[in-house]
Amino acid sequence: MTNKEILKKQIIYRSAHRGSKEMDILLGNFVKGHIDDFSDDDLKNLEQILFIEDEILYRWYFDKKDSDVIPNNKVSKMLKDFRLYQNK
């Protein structure tokens, strides 16, 4: 197993086992839908986001509160634009 494969597995697990159900669902679905599209740098950026406390991520995503803790990169922009329930 390569380092990238190991990192992907860790990210998949951590994104779905956060501690709050809302963030488990949001991050778990986001990661599940995008993990194979991410470059090595994107995976590192995503891992950095997963180290941020749920409360901060929740406010940033759901309440649209800006946070200096959230990095401004491609992955955070994709997450910000991610919608759990899209009309099909």
Which residues does each PLM region occupy?
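Positively charged, polar, low-complexity stretches
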Residues: 2-44, 49-88
